[in-house]
Amino acid sequence: MTAVYMNGGGLVNPHYARWDRRDSVESGCQTESSKEGEEGQPRQLTPFEKLTQDMSQDEKVVREITLGKRIGFYRIRGEIGSGNFSQVKLGIHSLTKEKVAIKILDKTKLDQKTQRLLSREISSMEKLHHPNIIRLYEVVETLSKLHLVMEYAGGGELFGKISTEGKLSEPESKLIFSQIVSAVKHMHENQIIHRDLKAENVFYTSNTCVKVGDFGFSTVSKKGEMLNTFCGSPPYAAPELFRDEHYIGIYVDIWALGVLLYFMVTGTMPFRAETVAKLKKSILEGTYSVPPHVSEPCHRLIRGVLQQIPTERYGIDCIMNDEWMQGVPYPTPLEPFQLDPKHLSETSTLKEEENEVKSTLEHLGITEEHIRNNQGRDARSSITGVYRIILHRVQRKKALESVPVMMLPDPKERDLKKGSRVYRGIRHTSKFCSIL
């Protein structure tokens, strides 16, 4: 079956960045022997020229490509995770040395349903501009595999932290939860429903900063639009997913936020069972208990979100203005930015950060001519990948992605408060099926 993927949200014939010798020719790169200065003297290759040349002429690099240890401009390291239809590996971008997460999918296993999910995943990530949402840098295709190159969050999953260290303190929970809620608000304002919010899909980039990732089950849904597919992890599933033929997406995401908050402040799940059938019964009954160490304001917020009737659940704004969340700063969305570098070659009036990005690209050897030749390739281009990585780096440096700061209690004091309560549950695997 021929894979078809997103271009502006629709399904079209695939056109992914597949590196071959044409890339260096189209980008204006020549072999080293033909690189001469104005007086006919050999000159040093730019980093971009050197890399593109090595990918076709350097024996070691060619061998890495052949063995699957390199794709495009990325050297592939060890596995750092796995998704519903994929594995995730650490990658190093050869030009910028940026660490990235590379989601690898086997093209032979991409049926029509999986193709639609992948298309939505790419589309969703490219529509969102928020400091607490994982970014997509590039999409690379080889003969047998597809690679989604994304921002790397080196601090691990929220699930892993709580599973090994125990529940978070309430001040820490507020800080982390505020970032997740702000990210979800941004999604919903852009008509995107995540449908798989859980601790396994929240990633630390520092001790106090997290990002929401894995948009593999996301979809676009207008306000009030009814959906009819079950997506996500059963312990986080809202009751209407088990009960009704249709559901409204934002309410499902909000329910998952309630489960997530409960997990953060207690170190365990509100609804637990040995089988999915028993779990379904527990969720439909809506019976759960909140440990006495949880403050009353936090308890009320959890209760307000985990309402059986979707329309009676707290909305995002209500959550953000809740008593328990008072005094917690919410990150704000970034100003929309260009996902393609073409504007750098089309206008002479650039913002400060755009000039810095352009200057860095030129230092690497990526000129306006390369950028003009790159038009129309979207994320499926090594040049676009370099541009997005550098843009993100510049934005981080300018504190557009600020890291929250708060005073946390002494670790020993936290351990005493937690006692021996450490969540030893297994990772929650997301499911996909149609509700009949």
UniProtKB/Swiss-Prot annotation:
It comes from the Eukaryota. Gene3D superfamilies: Transferase(Phosphotransferase) domain 1. The keyword Phosphoprotein applies. It holds the Pfam family Pkinase. Residues 74-325 form the Protein kinase domain. ATP binds at I80, G81, S82, G83, N84, F85, S86, Q87, V88, K103. CDD domains: STKc_NIM1 (cd14075). One of its GO terms (molecular function) is magnesium ion binding. GO terms for biological process: intracellular signal transduction; protein phosphorylation. The modification Phosphothreonine is found at T229. It catalyses: L-seryl-[protein] + ATP = O-phospho-L-seryl-[protein] + ADP + H(+); L-threonyl-[protein] + ATP = O-phospho-L-threonyl-[protein] + ADP + H(+). Its EC number is 2.7.11.1. InterPro entries: Kinase-like_dom_sf, NIM1K_STKc, Prot_kinase_dom, Protein_kinase_ATP_BS, Ser/Thr_kinase_AS. It is an enzyme of class 2 (transferase). Keywords: ATP-binding, Kinase, Magnesium, Metal-binding, Nucleotide-binding, Phosphoprotein, Serine/threonine-protein kinase, Transferase. Changing P333S: In a lung neuroendocrine carcinoma sample; somatic mutation. Its cofactor is Mg(2+). Residues 23-55 are annotated as: Disordered. The active site is at D196. This is Serine/threonine-protein kinase NIM1. It comes from Homo sapiens. The gene is NIM1K.
